[in-house]
């Protein structure tokens, strides 16, 4: 895992077309903005897991959604 330090307003690049910008920090929460082409899906991990569970027809681990 690559670990980076960024300040509010700073950006990192993923490949040539995806940018992740730190928008704000408040306590233990970090707000980030992601710019990516329409063909690149961007989801929070728990949403991605739900989508994958629904595709396979199984219930997600950890409870009901």
Curated annotation (Swiss-Prot):
Transmembrane segments: none annotated. It holds the Pfam family CsrA. It is found in: Cytoplasm. GO terms for molecular function: mRNA 5'-UTR binding. SUPFAM superfamilies: CsrA-like. GO terms for biological process: mRNA catabolic process; negative regulation of translational initiation; positive regulation of translational initiation; regulation of carbohydrate metabolic process. InterPro entries: CsrA, CsrA_sf. Homodimer; the beta-strands of each monomer intercalate to form a hydrophobic core, while the alpha-helices form wings that extend away from the core. Belongs to the CsrA/RsmA family. This is Translational regulator CsrA.
């Amino acid at each position: 895992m690559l670990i980076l330090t960024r300040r509010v307003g700073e950006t990192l690049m993923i490949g040539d077309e995806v940018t992740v910008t730190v928008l704000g920090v408040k306590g233990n929460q970090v707000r980030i903005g992601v710019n990516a082409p329409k063909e690149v899906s961007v989801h929070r991990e728990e949403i991605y897991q739900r989508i994958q569970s629904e595709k396979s027809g199984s219930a997600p681990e950890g409870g009901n959604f």
